[in-house]
């Protein structure tokens, strides 16, 4: 549906912000390595034009302008091995009781997609710092989650799985940054508090269309912390695939152009490792998706004191 292949939003060297179609060197697929882009004019969700005007990229920004994002939906427990690694022995008993009706008999695999929301203010760019606000500095349970991100391109209501991909603008990679204590012990059964802080959903580095990603259900996905690989999987291992996810979420609830869907993370999160691995001030977190690229973000603890 889109005439661009790799949509980026960027600050150019002339000081202006543009949408553009990233220009990559031969053999390079990581949009984060783009240094130039052809400027895109018009409506990225409708009539637009990829011009011949080329601009130098100074900084890659969040792929969508704030006014273009309507809702940020997220799936939890959408890879079987991840669901198992965060099963009973790792979780607060109150959370287990709340989730009991949503899980299959083995207590690990959801019957239906597990949906939660993040505020639009949680979105950040592919190189922005991950701000750890004073309220989230209590405890040592700061975690990472690499995820394939779907960007909806046109309104989708009650769509079938067969037609679901027709409503996709493209795909990005994101990090569903999580504070497990606020998510599980303090969240009252709701996950948004522990996952929805400002800047806790960096994504990008651009939006890749189906011109490039022929099969979004077979892409390598990974996380590195300070250069060490801690997650390494493939999107084919999702419990609820991309077609199923879009169709399910559109039943009775219209998905709008600009809606963003984080589709869950594979195994290897800090909470599930032995010993557990929690993010610290100054850590560098890289999440990557095959044929899309990577986001590299530094964890930065705020120096302000919390009022709570």
Region annotations inferred by a language model:
Residues 1-114, 286, 303-308:
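N-terminal non-catalytic cap/leader segment that marks the start of a structured domain
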Residues 2-5, 17, 50-62, 82-85, ...:
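Catalytic-pocket segment enriched in acidic/His residues
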Residues 15-17, 80-82, 99-101, 123-124, ...:
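Short, acidic Gly/Pro/Ser/Thr-rich loop/turn segments
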Residues 32, 45, 117-131:
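A glycine-rich (often HGG/GG-containing) alpha/beta subdomain
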Residues 61-64, 85-86, 103-106, 130-142, ...:
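A generic local secondary-structure boundary/capping motif
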Residues 91-97, 108-126, 142-144, 280-291:
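Structural signature of FAD isoalloxazine-binding scaffolds in flavoprotein oxidoreductases
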Residues 116, 144, 149-155, 254:
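Short, conserved beta-strand element in jelly-roll/cupin
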Residues 149-175:
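RNA pseudouridine synthases
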């Amino acid at each position: 549906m889109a005439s661009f292949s790799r949509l980026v939003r960027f600050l150019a060297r002339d000081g202006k912000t543009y949408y553009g179609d990233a220009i990559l060197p031969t053999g390079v697929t990581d949009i984060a390595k783009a240094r130039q882009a052809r400027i895109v004019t018009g409506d990225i969700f409708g009539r637009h034009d990829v011009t011949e005007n080329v601009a130098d990229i100074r900084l890659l920004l969040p792929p969508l302008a704030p006014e273009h994002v309507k809702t940020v939906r997220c799936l939890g427990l959408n890879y079987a091995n991840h669901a198992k690694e965060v099963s009973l022995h790792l979780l607060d008993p109150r959370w287990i009781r709340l989730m009991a009706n949503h899980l299959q008999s083995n207590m690990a695999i959801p019957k239906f997609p597990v949906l939660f929301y993040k505020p639009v203010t949680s979105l950040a760019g592919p190189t922005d710092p991950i701000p750890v606000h004073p309220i989230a500095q209590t405890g040592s349970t700061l975690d990472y989650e690499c995820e394939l991100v779907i960007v909806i391109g046109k309104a989708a209501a009650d769509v079938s799985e067969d037609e679901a991909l027709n409503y996709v603008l493209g795909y990005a990679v994101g990090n569903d940054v999580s504070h497990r204590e606020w998510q599980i012990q303090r969240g009252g059964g709701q996950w948004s508090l522990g996952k929805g802080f400002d800047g806790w959903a960096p994504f990008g580095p651009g939006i890749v269309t189906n011109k490039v990603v022929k099969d979004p259900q077979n892409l390598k996905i990974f996380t590195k912390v300070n250069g060490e690989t801690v997650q390494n999987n493939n999107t084919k291992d999702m419990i609820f695939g991309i077609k199923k996810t879009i169709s399910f979420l559109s039943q009775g609830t219209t998905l709008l152009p600009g809606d963003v869907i984080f589709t869950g993370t594979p195994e290897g999160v800090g909470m599930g490792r032995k010993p557990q691995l929690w993010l610290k001030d100054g850590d560098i977190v890289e999440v990557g998706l095959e044929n899309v690229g990577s986001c590299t973000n530094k964890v930065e603890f705020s120096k302000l004191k919390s009022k709570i």
